[in-house]
């Protein structure tokens, strides 16, 4: 469980607990093809982590009232490229995935 008081009121977040070493690709397979292509050659556990975290990001964007249908691609250093008016952060580790987003006018950066 994540403590909502850790985030500003304007932030929306999504968390997911999964089985350790999960290779469930359900959410990965739901991603935009351009997102799936970012890790197309990775092992299944990496695809599952990536897919779950990106899926959480899309859920959080929708909760924020933003278009969640566009792919969240990567910048040159691997960071997520959020929509222009949004700041956010992704995380994934064994058994846990999460994303948090907020309007950039109110929250300049997160991480």
Q: Which functions belong to the PLM regions below?
A:
Residues 1-110:
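Core catalytic alpha/beta fold that binds nucleotide/phospho-ligands
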